[in-house]
Amino acid sequence: MISYIKTELMKEKRSANFKLGIIVPIIFVLFNIAMVSLMGKSPEGKSYILATSFNWYPFLILPIVLSLLVVNISGKEKSEHIVLQKSKNLSFAKMELAKNIIIVAELLTIIVVSTILMFTFATFFLGERISLSQLIMATICLFIGSLPVVVLSFLIYGLIKKKAILILLNFVLTFPSAVIAVTNNWILFPWSYNLRMLSPVVGVHPNGTFLDTGSELMNMETTYLGLFLSIAVYAVVLTLNLLIKNKRSKCFV
């Protein structure tokens, strides 16, 4: 398994995803600067930069980034490569697992670097006091809450093999997430996990407005449930995807 991971890692060093890892954190900071500049000074006890970082950004930009990460690493495998891999008796399931591990690691790196840059900008340029524990919890939720979309993207792309369709699909499915996130059906819609989990952590409604202290959306139990669901969905869909890859490798001619 280690050899599969090393192979995928070597491919990524020369790929578009390497450039994304550099560009996305910069976009993250510029996006926050633009949004905060438009909104002005944060209300007492609230933070516009937290709202833009952990609500608007996951809603507007992150789904596209996740789609690009997946299609870039999966789209490298052309038909001639698959024939060669089959002739060498390589495991398609292990290759898929290696790709998942690499993308999850890249996603974690992007989110952590973006958060550090945002914290630095907010602290030294905006003079905001952001709770470090709150920031760490929000970062964890954003990362884990993105895992279901990552693994579903791998599954969908493996079935349709169309980059544009996957990107468009993730973009479209993100739009109802803010509405679904405030209903009991949010647990059935992985694209809403981030918005729902982060609401009590950063005090922001899924629609982007600030929450009152007594709001039912401030219940942290929902965050813990979302973390569990995200990991569970990721594990189940990943297992399903690996089984499909394993079956296809046996049937491949």
Identify the function of each model-found stretch.
Residues 50, 67-88, 92:
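Transmembrane helix boundary and interhelical loop/hinge segments in multi-pass membrane proteins
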Residues 93-94, 156-163, 247-249:
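Membrane-interface helix-boundary motifs at transmembrane edges
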Residues 25-72, 98-161, 170, 175-178, ...:
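Secretory targeting signals
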Residues 39-49, 167, 172-253:
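Terminal transmembrane helical anchor/hairpin motif
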Residues 89-101:
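Amphipathic cytosolic juxtamembrane alpha-helices at the membrane-cytosol interface
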Residues 1-25, 250-252:
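Aromatic- and glycine-rich beta-strand/loop motifs that create alpha-glucan
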